[in-house]
């Protein structure tokens, strides 16, 4: 259950913090952005209101994510927790129409696979 502003305990000391970049959100996008900026030498502060890992519906990674995960040095960890995904299928609400897309048939033939992961495990990495 989320706390209301009056229930949040402030930090014992308030200090003026300076940075080059303030990243709001520590999920996959925010933490990746903060990591890449810090690698470039920027002073980064990342702010996240939630506690991680937390329950969240699964994360459906796309093939274009794979090179970035390699660059971040976490590809092997993702492989251990992920279920290999070679494509996606879309179904209409009435299930009368479907569309199957195989990643190997997409615009970049080199990016032919991805993973489906549990978000809580993904957040830990």
Predicted regions and their residues:
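Conserved N-terminal helical subregion
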Residues: 92-125
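Glycine-rich FAD pyrophosphate-binding loop
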Residues: 22, 38-59
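Conserved SAM/SAH-binding loop-helix junction
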Residues: 32
């Amino acid at each position: 259950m989320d706390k209301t502003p009056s229930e949040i305990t402030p930090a014992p000391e308030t200090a003026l913090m300076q940075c080059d970049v303030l990243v709001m959100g520590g999920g996959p996008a925010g933490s990746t952005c903060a990591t890449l900026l810090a690698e470039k030498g920027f002073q980064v502060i990342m702010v996240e209101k939630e506690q991680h890992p937390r329950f969240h519906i699964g994360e459906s990674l796309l093939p274009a994510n794979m090179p970035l995960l390699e660059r971040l040095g976490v590809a092997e960890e993702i492989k251990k927790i992920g279920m290999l995904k070679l494509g996606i299928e879309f179904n209409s609400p009435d299930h009368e129409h479907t569309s199957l897309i195989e990643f190997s048939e997409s615009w970049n033939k080199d990016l032919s696979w991805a993973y489906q992961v549990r978000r809580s495990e993904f957040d830990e990495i």
